[in-house]
Every structure is written in C-alpha cells, then in structure tokens.
Amino acid sequence: MISAPDVVAFTKEEEYEEEPYNEPALPEEYSVPLFPFASQGANPWSKLSGAKFSRDFILISEFSEQVGPQPLLTIPNDTKVFGTFDLNYFSLRIMSVDYQASFVGHPPGSAYPKLNFVEDSKVVLGDSKEGAFAYVHHLTLYDLEARGFVRPFCMAYISADQHKIMQQFQELSAEFSRASECLKTGNRKAFAGELEKKLKDLDYTRTVLHTETEIQKKANDKGFYSSQAIEKANELASVEKSIIEHQDLLKQIRSYPHRKLKGHDLCPGEMEHIQDQASQASTTSNPDESADTDLYTCRPAYTPKLIKAKSTKCFDKKLKTLEELCDTEYFTQTLAQLSHIEHMFRGDLCYLLTSQIDRALLKQQHITNFLFEDFVEVDDRMVEKQESIPSKPSQDRPPSSSLEECPIPKVLISVGSYKSSVESVLIKMEQELGDEEYKEVEVTELSSFDPQENLDYLDMDMKGSISSGESIEVLGTEKSTSVLSKSDSQASLTVPLSPQVVRSKAVSHRTISEDSIEVLSTCPSEALIPDDFKASYPSAINEEESYPDGNEGAIRFQASISPPELGETEEGSIENTPSQIDSSCCIGKESDGQLVLPSTPAHTHSDEDGVVSSPPQRHRQKDQGFRVDFSVENANPSSRDNSCEGFPAYELDPSHLLASRDISKTSLDNYSDTTSYVSSVASTSSDRIPSAYPAGLSSDRHKKRAGQNALKFIRQYPFAHPAIYSLLSGRTLVVLGEDEAIVRKLVTALAIFVPSYGCYAKPVKHWASSPLHIMDFQKWKLIGLQRVASPAGAGTLHALSRYSRYTSILDLDNKTLRCPLYRGTLVPRLADHRTQIKRGSTYYLHVQSMLTQLCSKAFLYTFCHHLHLPTHDKETEELVASRQMSFLKLTLGLVNEDVRVVQYLAELLKLHYMQESPGTSHPMLRFDYVPSFLYKI
C-alpha cells in the first residue's frame, strides 16, 4: 500500500508550484505617498508638523538703520500664537532684500532732494527649516530724521500651508494693499506735520542768526569780518538752503495724493483730505505762510526752537516708532484692518475656498437668497465699489425710507392664493401716502377638514355688536355665495364689485339654516376685519359659534350691505361685472368722510334663501379675493366705544398700541443676534418699515452659538418638529417664559428657521414684556414673551389666549407646545434629534444647506408660469390648482404639510418681487383656522 509520503515522492515539483500572480500596476493618480511626518505621530489632517507655530499670524518688521531687521509687532499680539517661532530670524529673511530700492536725495540735475514715491512690492517667501511660508508686503514710510527720509517696513502673513498662500495671493494682495494705503496716508500726514514744525524751527533759527549777525556787525569797528561772523554767515546760508529744501519736500508730500485721485485703494478718510487739499492754494516760498498753513488738521500752537548747526542724524538718536510715524487715527484703522485680514484668512484652505464659492453663489442667487441667507457676509466690498467715497461702518447700511418714500405696490397678491386644506382669512395692511391708513381684507376660499376635529379646536366667539347706520354686514348660509348688495338707506355709499366664487364644504353642524358668521363694522369707512382687531381699531368681527347639534352646513363668507337695524338684509343680487374692471376698482377712495367706491348695477332678487348671490367671474383670480379699504382716521368715536364693550382697558386705549409695546426701545442685543424692525411712533402702522440694520450681524461665533442652541432644543424637546414647521410655514411662534436669558437664547436659535421678508429685515422679536396686539403678528413671526407671575401679567396671558388660534405657543416653563399637527418629511431631515452632528457651526451649515434646497423648490414653483396660468380659456381653476398640487407632490416630492411650507415661501418671493422697492414690502397678516394640538413632555 502506498502511503502519503510515497505519493509525494512520485510527484513533480512543477505541479505544486503555482504560477506567480502579477498584480496590475496601480494607476499613477492612485499612488499616494506616505505622509512625511507619519513617524512623528502626526495625523494627516493636522497642519505641517514642521511648523513651530499653532496658527497663522501677521508680522510687521522694519529694516532699522541702527540695528538692522527687527520685528515690531504681531497680530494677534499673543506669544502663544507663534510659540517658539524665531521672529528675529524670519525678519532677517524677509527684509534681507531691499524690494523698495529707490533713489532719495539729490538726483542729477536737481539742486534739492526729491522724494520718489515707489509702489509697494509683494513677494512670497518660504522657509523649509522653520516650516513657514509668508506673503510679504513691502512698503516705505517717510521719516524726517531717517537716512534719506525713508524707513522700510514690511507686513507678512505667515502660514504653515504653502498652498494657502499661493491660492489666496490675489485676495491677500488686495487686503494688504488697503492696509498699506491707510498706513502710508497717515504717514504722509504725520510727515507733513513734521516738515511744518521743522520749517518753523528753521525760520526761528534764521531770525536768531540774523539778529546775532547784526549785533556782530555793530560791534565790529575794524571794517573786516571776524571768523565768528563768517561762521554765522555760513550757518545762515545753510539755514536758508535747508528752508528751501524743506519747502520743496512739503510741496512734494502734499502733491502726492492728487496723483491717486483715480486710484481704487484709498482708505477711509483719505478722500476727505484730498478734497480739502484741492481747495487750498499751493505752498508759497514764504516760510511764514508755509508754517502757518496747515492743510491736514488743526493742531495746537507749536513753539519753535533753535536748531543747532551740527547734524542731528546720529546713531545715538532714537528713531520714531511705527505709531509715531503715522497719524493716530490712521494707525488705529490699519491695526483694525490687519486684524480683519487675520480673521478673514483664518482656517484651512478648503474652508476659505468653500466660503468664497458660497459668497460668489449668493451674489448670483439674488432671487431667493433674501429668505434665509445672511447678507452681512455677502461681500461688503460690493458697496465700496459702487460708492466713490467710502463711508464709515455706521453709514454702510441703507437708510430707512420714510412712509412717503415707500411706493405702494400696484399689484396686490395674497399669501393664501393657493388652495389650503384649512379655512383661511388673510388681511393685507397697506400704508398709503399721507396720514390715512388703509387696510385690505381678503376672504379666501374655504375647504373642508374633519368636522369633529373642527368642533374640538375651532374657537368661535359669540359676542354682540351694535351696527351703525353705515355698517357693512357679511352674512353667510349653506347655499350662499360671495356677493355684495346695497341697501336703500345707503344710497350715498358706493360699493365695489368683487364677485368671487367661494367654494365650501361641510365643516360644522347647524340647527338653523340662517346661522351665519357676521362681520359687523361700526365705522363709516371700515373694511371687514376679524374680531381680534377690536383691541387696536374701532371695528369688530363677531363669529357665531357652530352648533354641534344641527343639520350639516357650511361656513360661508358673503359680502352685503345691511340697514341700520341688525339682521335686516335686503334681498337681491348684483349683476356680473364687466371683464374690463381693473384691480384698482377694489380700492376705495375717501372723500368728505365717506367711502367712495364704484357704482353698482341694479339688484336681482333671490327667493331661495334670502341672500344675494352672484355667478362666478372668469377674469377674477382666486387670490384677489374681496377687498375693501377703510380709514382709521375717520372712525366714529361713539361707534368705537360701542364696539369695544367688554374688552380690557389696555385694548380700548388706541395709544396703547404705541406706548405699551417697546416701539422706540429696541435693544442693541437684537441687532447682534438677528435684526428685526425699527419701530416708529408716528402712526399705528408706521412701525412696519424694515430695520435699516443688517439682518443679523452674524459672526462665526454667533452661528456656532445659534447652531448649538438649536441642537439642544431639538434633542431636549420631542415636539421640536411642529415648532419649526410653524416658523417655516409663516405661523407666528410665541416663546413664553419667565427667564429673559433663556427665552432670548432659544429665540436666537430658532431664528435660523425664520424666513425673512427682505434683505434688511428679520421678523424676530427677541423679548417683549407687554401684551401682544394684532399688529405684532403682522410684524413678527418669532416672539419672545415674558411671563409675569404678578397680577399685572394677567393682561399678557389674556391677550395671548385671545390670539392663540392664530399662533403657536411654546411654553418653556411648563414644557408645552400648542400648535397645528405636522406630518411631513422635510423637518425631520432638517432637525433630526438622532443626528451625529456635535458642533454648532456644523449644524448651522447643515441647516443652511437644507434651506437652500427648500428655496430652490420654492423658486421652481414660483416661476413656472404654466403652473399658475390657465392653458386655455375653458380651463377651470380646479384644474389649475390640481396641476399645481401635482407639481408639488410628484415633481418636487413634497408630502402633507411640506406643501404649505413651499407655498408660503413662494408667496414671499412673489410679494418681494412685486414691490418696486424690494425689502420694504409689508408682511401679510395671515390667519389659519386649523386645529391646534397640545404637546407635553
């Protein structure tokens, strides 16, 4: 029997030897060399380990004529920044070559010294030994006591990343050129001042020498000059020559800025000096005039001194410091500019490139970037390029235009022009020219939602009201449609025709078919406004509550004119309006205290339900609605008192709208977080003008803090999604709490989810201690409200409960949230409590990225015209709405409440670009009668 070893003995070696496997060569682009500092324990993501400093910094050095190259100061001025980095050695490296080499002295053919104004030189140097690379900006300053009147300096941006220096060379060059021009302008100013002082000294010395020479002449009786007289004469001639030389130097240094008039690198303040100098005459040869003339600034009187004959340019003389060489104001500006440069280029190269690309894209996305982007970070130098004279930081922001300058939009558009799943009453408030205040009321279409859900959450107030002789009454029943009728007692009152189809379905049960919602106006020139307006305006809305035990009915809004007696309505209808009626026909014109509106045709009787009706109009768009303008100025005081019975005193006082809310006391803290509005006490609606302050003086620290607080809110509160949805959909969120610091912190965090109305306005109120009014919900979409435990705070809670169905309320003390239900998918991706993001700045960037995607969807929905316009004449509004909804759900992938978010952003885009002055559009006051749910932890 053959064993295994025998079998092995009979086999050939070739059978067991496998053919060698030759691996394919790795492509060159995938060949990554080993990290050079891997043996030192460094990670590949850290900066070059060969560097002896921890972060980038700026070094200012000088080539001193006494000690050679020496460092002067660093920015930031902290020894921990550059660590063990040898500043003296590196100063020797960057100042070893005179890049500013120029002849200063007596050029050929000239008897006087000439200043050669050389341009700055810019070089890039590297030191592999120190692991440092630098952008070096060489410049020359002038010193009267220095050799050749010049002092060479350089400013260097030192970094461990060579690619950062090379790729950011243009940006570094531009920023350092600004700092250099500012420093040199201050130096020329100081140098001219030194020349003027020197001329005064020389003039005083010449006077003394003249006096001494005359004394010696009188004392000399021999008729020939002594050696002392000859020495005095030579000294006097030297002084005369020095005066001429210094006058020529002063003329040169003063004429330099005129050559820079067409330049673009003038620092702030330099243009003012140029204009002052251009208006004055040139320096004359008279030393008295040149000494007394000060073209730069008013200085205190200078006492001249006698100049010795010996030269003062000795090595034992102490040279001026950099601060002494430059004017104090300009030196401070230069240091601020250098600090700005250090902060601007701080961070990795990838971060800088991403930020630059982001700013470039923001300039291109000027259509949607006003919603969520921070415009302070969009290159501020665009303003400087547009203005010939740079202004101070406080003057960079655009001035707030007055009411007279705010143009009135010609096209009126409603935020609720789309068909919503809830009934919505939208009220547009406009400020007309002059002192009169007009309001627009738009009653939009009604759609159905769950009847039982409506009974639980829809709160209708049952309050009586006394109607005046010229009141407007809106009645609605199950079968009524939107119409207007005219009563016999109001022959002098003309009513606009605004026929509109109001489609509604069953939303509640009623016991009587005549049950209706009444909108009663007690003033001659009023529009139809909700019940809550009685707090601030002499008008009222009374909504009768739906009875649960009755026949199935519908809430309908119908416009009509009622006689003085309540409940008496004239039966009739109005004929169709011609299609030529313009939208301006709906705007009332007031004359002699009456509302003058277009005339109405004859009435037609409707026997069916006792109400007037009107067929739909094809030319009317559903977003135009029913509009009536009224004036608060002409309100009847007596009817005002009648309509305000039963309300708190703080709501009855019209001045409370101005005095009780911190209108003129907007704190500066709001501007450091997110800016809101600057209110005015001129009128009740004059405080709707957006603030002139930029929308959030956001810094990296502010973004980090806001992102971190937003992360804490998302992880701490399980109902964060409905709260964020309220902000994104335009529903005002009120943050209620006792601790002001906690409320402000949360409001600042949630402000990153609030869409803006314009470039310079953020509708955020960080802290309010007085009761809220209906106007507050027009201005603010995020409000921090103080909870007061004392009886004085009862008014605040009463007003908040009064408007609770219009707002979302986040109670920080009780950890509750009352707001509508949210079932979408957008907010969970935006604010996921299970996110692995730890840093606030990272989460802030994540939010900005998600909101940018959201804005792109809103842009597509807004400017796809085929979605909003009928394709043919016979296409109904239902088909247009169906096409819009199909685009939102199928094309954009939106579900449930996410549709409302995109629709709201789209309406903001429309409002923003329908205005003649974008950014100054008045926000829309929007009411959504949707059921609210109470969330608890």
From Swiss-Prot:
Sites of Phosphoserine modification: 402, 417, 468, 471, 489, 492, 498, 790
Principal location class: cytoplasm
Pfam families assigned to the protein according to its UniProt record, in alphabetical order: Folliculin
Effect seen on changing residue 796 to D: Phosphomimetic mutant; able to promote autophagosome maturation
GO CC terms in record: Atg1/ULK1 kinase complex; cell projection; chromatin; cytoplasm; guanyl-nucleotide exchange factor complex; nucleoplasm; postsynapse; presynapse
Compositionally biased intervals (Polar residues): 276-288, 388-403, 574-583
Listed result of changing residue 147 to A: Loss of C9ORF72-SMCR8 complex-mediated stimulation of RAB8A and RAB11A GTPase activity
The keyword Transcription regulation belongs to this UniProt entry's keyword annotation: yes
In-chain residues carrying the UniProt-annotated modification Phosphothreonine: 796
Disulfide bonds: none
Posttranslational modification: Phosphorylation by TBK1 is required to promote autophagosome maturation. Phosphorylated by ULK1.
Segments for region (Disordered): 274-293, 384-405, 564-645
Keyword Cytoplasm found: yes
Domain of life: Eukaryota
Compartments, as annotated in UniProt: Cytoplasm; Nucleus; Presynapse; Postsynapse
Region (Required for the homodimerization of the C9orf72-SMCR8 complex): 1-349
Keyword terms: Autophagy, Cell projection, Cytoplasm, Guanine-nucleotide releasing factor, Nucleus, Phosphoprotein, Synapse, Transcription, Transcription regulation
Domain uDENN FLCN/SMCR8-type: 48-220
InterPro entries noted in UniProt: FLCN/SMCR8_DENN (IPR037521), Folliculin/SMCR8_longin (IPR037520)
GO biological process: autophagy; negative regulation of autophagosome assembly; negative regulation of exocytosis; negative regulation of gene expression; negative regulation of immune response; negative regulation of macroautophagy; positive regulation of autophagosome maturation; positive regulation of TOR signaling
Annotated region (Interacts with WDR41 within the C9orf72-SMCR8 complex), positions in chain: 862-914
Domain called cDENN FLCN/SMCR8-type: residue spans: 318-835
Subunit-structure text: Component of the C9orf72-SMCR8 complex, at least composed of C9orf72, SMCR8 and WDR41. The complex is formed of two protomers, each individually consisting of one molecule each of C9orf72, SMCR8 and WDR41. The protomers homodimerize via an interaction between C9orf72 (via C-terminus) and SMCR8 (via N-terminus). Within each protomer SMCR8 (via DENN domain) acts as a bridging protein between WDR41 (via C-terminus and N-terminus) and C9orf72 (via C-terminus). The C9orf72-SMCR8 complex associates with the ULK1/ATG1 kinase complex. Interacts with C9orf72; the interaction is direct.
Family stated for the protein in its record: Belongs to the SMCR8 family.
Role of this protein: Component of the C9orf72-SMCR8 complex, a complex that has guanine nucleotide exchange factor (GEF) activity and regulates autophagy. In the complex, C9orf72 and SMCR8 probably constitute the catalytic subunits that promote the exchange of GDP to GTP, converting inactive GDP-bound RAB8A and RAB39B into their active GTP-bound form, thereby promoting autophagosome maturation. The C9orf72-SMCR8 complex also acts as a negative regulator of autophagy initiation by interacting with the ULK1/ATG1 kinase complex and inhibiting its protein kinase activity.
Record-given protein name: Guanine nucleotide exchange protein SMCR8
UniProt gene name: SMCR8
